[in-house]
């Protein structure tokens, strides 16, 4: 069984003006597709062929891990975004954020700061720890919470290819616009799972 590039949950121009169609064309259409292609080539004829993406991420290393994790991370990231989204979470998610960070404003400030300070290429995550508390975690390169006992709720991609076309080297500007796209409904479903 080969992996395929999952369909975006919206049109490539749907996130504009925050993330341009050109960025989606490269980030999704080229980078994400390349990870899928590389993964398929790397697992051919190995014990990983026929396994689920999550199982491969949890049990592999090296090139197979890097490509599998990047396929998973990107798919998760696209679902964390939505057109006409943003604002603040409500219900149990809002309560959990307030319990763990004091307020939504404090969470947003801490998450943004962690993403800005995430050195080099990587991901910044909101996760639910094994004890049920929410935490902000930054990973490098293809790192993912799937290899831990934490449940990923939200992520932002801070590899330069995620924002360079629209924001050049201004990661803080990208993060400011990221908040206008956060799909809180998806994040809430992850918390409830």
Curated annotation (Swiss-Prot):
InterPro entries reported for this sequence: Mn/Fe_SOD, Mn/Fe_SOD_BS, Mn/Fe_SOD_C, Mn/Fe_SOD_N, Mn/Fe_SOD_N_sf, SOD_C_sf
Keyword Membrane recorded: no
Catalytic class of the enzyme: oxidoreductase
Annotated EC: 1.15.1.1
Pfam families tied to this protein: Sod_Fe_C, Sod_Fe_N
Gene Ontology terms, MF aspect: metal ion binding; superoxide dismutase activity
Gene3D superfamilies membership: Fe,Mn superoxide dismutase (SOD) domain, Iron/manganese superoxide dismutase, C-terminal domain
Entry keyword annotation includes Oxidoreductase: yes
Cofactor(s) demanded: Fe cation
Domain of life: Bacteria
Keyword set, alphabetical order: Iron, Metal-binding, Oxidoreductase
Cysteines engaged in disulfide bonds, as pairs: none
Binding site for Fe cation: 27, 74, 157, 161
Catalytic activity: 2 superoxide + 2 H(+) = H2O2 + O2
Record note on cofactor: Binds 1 Fe cation per subunit.
Function, as annotated: Destroys superoxide anion radicals which are normally produced within the cells and which are toxic to biological systems.
Family: Belongs to the iron/manganese superoxide dismutase family.
PANTHER family: SUPEROXIDE DISMUTASE, SUPEROXIDE DISMUTASE [FE] 2, CHLOROPLASTIC
Record note on quaternary structure: Homodimer.
Name the UniProt record assigns to this protein: Superoxide dismutase [Fe]
């Amino acid at each position: 069984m080969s992996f395929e590039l999952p369909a975006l949950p919206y049109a490539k121009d749907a996130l504009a003006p925050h993330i341009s169609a050109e960025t989606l064309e490269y980030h999704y259409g080229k980078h994400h597709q390349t990870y899928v292609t590389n993964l398929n080539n790397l697992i051919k004829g190995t014990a990983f062929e026929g396994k689920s993406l999550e199982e491969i991420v949890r049990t592999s290393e090296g090139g197979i891990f890097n490509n599998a994790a990047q396929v998973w991370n990107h798919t998760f990231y696209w679902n964390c975004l939505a057109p006409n989204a943003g604002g603040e979470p409500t219900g149990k998610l809002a309560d959990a954020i307030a319990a763990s960070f004091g307020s939504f404003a404090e969470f947003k400030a801490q998450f943004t700061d962690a993403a800005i300070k995430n050195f080099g290429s990587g991901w910044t995550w909101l996760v639910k720890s094994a004890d049920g508390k929410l935490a902000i975690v930054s990973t490098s390169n293809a790192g993912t919470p799937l290899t831990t006992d934490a449940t990923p709720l939200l992520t932002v991609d801070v590899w330069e290819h995620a924002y360079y076309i629209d924001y050049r080297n201004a990661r803080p500007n990208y993060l400011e616009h990221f908040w206008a796209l956060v799909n809180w409904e998806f994040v809430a479903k992850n918390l409830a799972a």
